[in-house]
């Protein structure tokens, strides 16, 4: 679809959809969970274990220590040593959903922790191999979470829940691990750029990375859309100018899901944008396979952040 026809315009303005419906139709494809959380026994009276029994999937979160159990579909690429670096727990959002969180200690004493908001149609189980590899290669620890309705997180996916979910993750990272905002890099991929831009527009942090970002839901569905309507969803284009931290935008020139023009438009609207990474020939899901991806991330983190230039 390359633009708005007369009938589509009539439909939009006579019966405009609510942002939630646009969001649901465009964005959310939660996979079947590829993991569960298994309680670790804790010392109790007389040495007895005091952890709850049974795996945690969508049941109420309980205090205690948990380990992640991955299914074959998670396709974990590492061994037990790397798996032992992954901490998992469940927190609660302001919208009363239980949000699964993952902290990957890739580098002891790392200067930065990346708060990673993943793309669509994946969950923490499928992403944890990538997190181990990414954190090790860029010298950062990785913190991530599953959106409402993804993985073992409860609730249903929605735009409002996305914003509440990342707020819960941000607070958990800061309070549970004592990570200060100037040590947090917000990283959003695809649909994950939506909560990332929203949070970054409200809080200052060390830096922001937008990987294959979208400008808004309407602009994805109707590429000729030039303005943001009141019923639009995911209005990154209206929020990106409010970000006060350095922003690196990464986009493939042959992106078949979110057109390259979205990355260009956000770059032009973002006063804190640094030199972007436009990956020639890359699509929506293969940017990480190009050597310049890691090279640009390393240079951004090691040379271009204010704390590194001081």
Curated annotation (Swiss-Prot):
Q: Where is this region: Disordered?
A: 38-61
Keyword check for Isomerase: no
Q: Where does the protein principally reside?
A: membrane
Entry PTM: Palmitoylated on cysteine residues located in a cysteine cluster at the N-terminus which promotes membrane localization. Palmitoylation is required for post-synaptic localization and for depalmitoylating activity towards DLG4/PSD95.
Compartments annotated for it: namely: Cell membrane; Endosome membrane; Cell projection, Dendritic spine; Postsynaptic density membrane
Any GO CC annotation of this UniProt entry:
dendritic spine
Gene3D superfamilies attached to this UniProt entry: alpha/beta hydrolase
Q: Name one Pfam family in it.
A: Hydrolase_4
Which GO biological process annotations does it have? Answer: negative regulation of NLRP3 inflammasome complex assembly; negative regulation of protein localization to microtubule; positive regulation of protein localization to endosome; protein localization to membrane; regulation of postsynapse organization
User: GO terms for molecular function, please?
Assistant: palmitoyl-(protein) hydrolase activity
Q: Which domain of life does the UniProt lineage start with?
A: Eukaryota
The alphabetical list of record keywords is: Cell membrane, Cell projection, Endosome, Hydrolase, Lipoprotein, Membrane, Palmitate, Phosphoprotein, Postsynaptic cell membrane, Synapse
* Name recorded for this polypeptide: Alpha/beta hydrolase domain-containing protein 17A
Question: Can you name the source organism?
Answer: Mus musculus
Instruction: Give the gene that encodes this protein.
Output: Abhd17a
